[in-house]
Curated annotation (Swiss-Prot):
Family statement drawn from the similarity comment of this UniProt entry: Belongs to the sea anemone type 1 potassium channel toxin family. Type 1b subfamily.
Name this protein carries in UniProt: Kappa-actitoxin-Avd6a
Residues marked Important for binding to potassium channels (site): 6, 13, 22
GO CC, alphabetical: extracellular region; nematocyst
Cysteines joined through disulfide linkages: 2-36, 11-29, 20-33
Organism of provenance: Anemonia sulcata (Mediterranean snakelocks sea anemone)
GO MF annotation, one: toxin activity
Subcellular location: Secreted; Nematocyst
Region (Crucial for binding to potassium channels): 24-25
Domain ShKT intervals: 2-36
Length: 36
């Protein structure tokens, strides 16, 4: 299940700020963060 549960803009922002390490974002922005 490789998808972003949060809005695309939110996940883009998360990745730019290197917040993909956060469990919340790693799970909800899996596609953008490449966690799958």
């Amino acid at each position: 299940a490789c998808k972003d549960n949060f809005a695309a803009a939110t996940c883009k922002h998360v990745k730019e700020n290197k917040n993909c390490g956060s469990q919340k974002y790693a799970t909800n922005c899996a596609k953008t963060c490449g966690k799958c």
